[in-house]
Amino acid sequence: MAEWLASIMPNVVDYSGKFWSSCQATMQMFLIAGGFTLIFGSIFGVLLTVTKKGGIAENRFLYVLVNTVTNVFRSIPFVILLIFLIPLTRAIVGTAIGVKGAIVPLVFGAVPFFTRQVEAALANVSPGKVEAAASMGSGKLGIIFRVYLHEAVPDLIRAVTITAISLIGLTTMAGAVGAGGIGSFAINYGQNLHHQDIVNVCVVVLLLFVSVIQGLGNSLSRRTTNRSLFQHKVETK
């Protein structure tokens, strides 16, 4: 097996230590930045939903503030954002390179995208259900958690899936400018040294990673839709 691998991707075998460390760095960036993105993106998405005109907690100032900041950071290409945030990144984590240096720009790049995804998912919740909950005495937090977030679970899962796949792309771009990870490995040891097998393996690894995330997202989304749950109950009867 080892001889066969060495014959089809000799350079990957030679740099196997670097390859596995780059995979680990990519996973670290993805998980840490993804966690922050999930938290802050959900908060901002909910804020945009409830503070808009006609929302359950209408607040024009807060809505305009969050909406404007989201639009500003969404409009900046990620590579430019990486450079722009170098001073802030150094102030927060002490460095602008490596995995630690990539977390801040990754969060700033992914949160606005996920915020819009959450806002769109919550917009699909029927206003009638919100009004019904309010008429039964539910408070604002109750409506947010028991109506908006509960009813939008399938769409929110799709939003998380799309954002996770997008975040993988951002981690590879971050690697191209010194953050490490698979993107950095593909450029430094693949393209720069003309080792095509390294580039090919990096592409395959990323494709597998994306396919797993997409498959999990699709499965969870189907399982949490009312139609899927209804069909499951009928079949079990």
Give the location of each predicted region.
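Short, strongly hydrophobic alpha-helical membrane anchors
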Residues: 1-22
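Membrane-interfacial segments
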Residues: 47-56, 89, 93, 126, ...
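C-terminal transmembrane helix and the adjacent membrane-cytosol boundary/short C-terminal tail
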Residues: 47-53, 135, 199-237
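Transmembrane alpha-helices
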Residues: 140-171
